[in-house]
Swiss-Prot record:
The gene is CAR2. It comes from Arabidopsis thaliana. Its cofactor is Ca(2+). Ca(2+) 2 binds at residues 22, 27, 73-75. Its main location: membrane. This is Protein C2-DOMAIN ABA-RELATED 2. Binds to PYR/PYL/RCAR abscisic acid intracellular receptors in an ABA-independent manner, both at the plasma membrane and in the nucleus. Pfam families: C2. Residues 1-104 form the C2 domain.
Length: 174
């Protein structure tokens, strides 16, 4: 694999107030894309407030590529219906990793960085990047776009496999 910086584990926690696409409910699943990579969760039957609690792991070679989240309603006899989408960038998350590597020894629960919800991102509320149980994690609620309603809750975690984000590594442009 070309210059892999590390792995990004996305914990797809849940969908909240998802759109109805069948008669009274939906059978939602999530597709996650980054560059040419495409992963998906399992389908949850008849549920608009879905608890996936599923881990999907992406290889990060180009940290400037956005992560795209797409939610669909599974249909058995026709094309699956779109239930919204969202995009986020991992630059702030990777910058928080660099900060933690420089500071080291952070107390449990330390907030390393906050990202405000704005028109330039799909966050529905402030997202904090924190030091938790010896790892850097970011919890986020993404407001689904191109749909009447719905949010997806995710947690990001970095798995360093190359040392590319440590103090000793050469600068990697973000």
């Amino acid at each position: 694999m070309e210059n892999m910086l590390g792995l990004l584990r996305l914990h797809v926690i849940r969908g909240v107030n998802l759109a109805i696409r069948d008669s009274q409910s939906s059978d939602p699943y999530v597709i996650v894309r980054m560059g040419k990579q495409k992963l998906r969760t399992r389908v949850m039957k008849k549920n608009l407030n879905t608890e996936w609690n599923e881990d999907l792991t992406l290889s990060v070679t180009d940290p400037t590529l956005p992560v795209k989240i797409m939610v669909y309603d599974r249909d058995r006899f026709s094309r699956d219906d779109k239930m919204g989408d969202a995009i986020f960038h991992i630059d702030p998350f990777l910058e928080a990793i660099r900060i933690q590597n420089q500071l080291g020894g952070l107390p449990e629960g330390t907030v390393i960085m906050k990202i405000q919800a704005s028109r330039q991102n799909c966050l529905s509320e402030e997202s904090k990047i924190v030091w938790h149980k010896g790892k850097i994690v970011q919890n986020m609620f993404l407001k689904l776009q191109n749909v009447e309603r719905g949010e997806i809750e995710l947690q990001l975690e970095w798995i360093d496999v190359s040392g590319a984000l440590t103090d000793d590594a050469e600068d990697v442009a973000f």
